[in-house]
Amino acid sequence: VSICTAQREIENYIRRLIAQRIDGVFIVGMPPLSDEKYHEIIFNMVEAGIRVLINGIILKDSKEISHIFVDHMTGIDKAVSYLKSMGHTHIAMVSTFGRNSNFDIRDRMFFSAMDKYLPDSPKIFVSETGIRNPDMDSSYSLTKRLLTDHPEVTAVICLNDLMAYGVIQAAAYFNKSVPDELSVIGMDDIYISRNFNPTVTSIGFDKREYGMMAFELLYNHIKKNIIKDIDIRTELYIRSSTGLAPGLK
């Protein structure tokens, strides 16, 4: 078992993996490639006899690839429901994926939850397709644009916790207090979110369960040629980055 990262020269890296005749690979993150190039690389591995497990929806209809899905639909549904219960009606999502991305469907999940709980509220989605890294820097710049164009926004949902930290920094730039004037929700519930100031409300999942299920899926694919997709349930962990909408305190 090897754990590795390939941020650069991805195609050369994959060619080396194929040459080494590895048994299987678990792809967790999305490389900065076009959809077509990414699909080509995946199927090159499949054709070489490598068993492939993918985190997420990419090539979800393939009968040759196993998938593990984090059930963000339930988590985003809980997040929007919770924000509504706290009086928020102007809720935005900040993303580094464009609308209707082949790599990520959380934008559609957000729109669905808004239709369900706040059908009369605006659906505010800010993204930049040229940005591939969902990190603090990207969310900081996106949130500055968001709060300039939509100062009425009182809550923001982010693709991950790192982006939530960037939103909190951007709020400080506009002298907006978190959570008194802006509530912020991240995803993944990484360890630092429990110690960040303020602590970050996050859509999270059991990392141990995720790791065990990923290993089991790939092992069964390699040893028994069992191809399977599974969902990992999510929860909303409420902390101090969210609160009542302004004017309701």
Task: Map each language-model feature to its residues.
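Glycine/Thr-rich phosphate-binding loops of Rossmann-like dinucleotide-binding domains
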Residues: 34-35, 62, 101, 166, ...
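Glycine-rich phosphate/diphosphate-binding loops that line cofactor/substrate pockets in enzymes
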Residues: 80-91
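Periplasmic-binding protein-like
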Residues: 22-32, 53, 92-94, 150-160, ...
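Flexible loop/turn connectors
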Residues: 121-122, 142-249
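Residue-level detector of anion-binding/catalytic polar loops
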Residues: 51, 89, 177
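Hinge/beta->alpha junction and helix N-cap segments in small-molecule ligand-binding domains
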Residues: 2-12, 31-32, 57, 67-78, ...
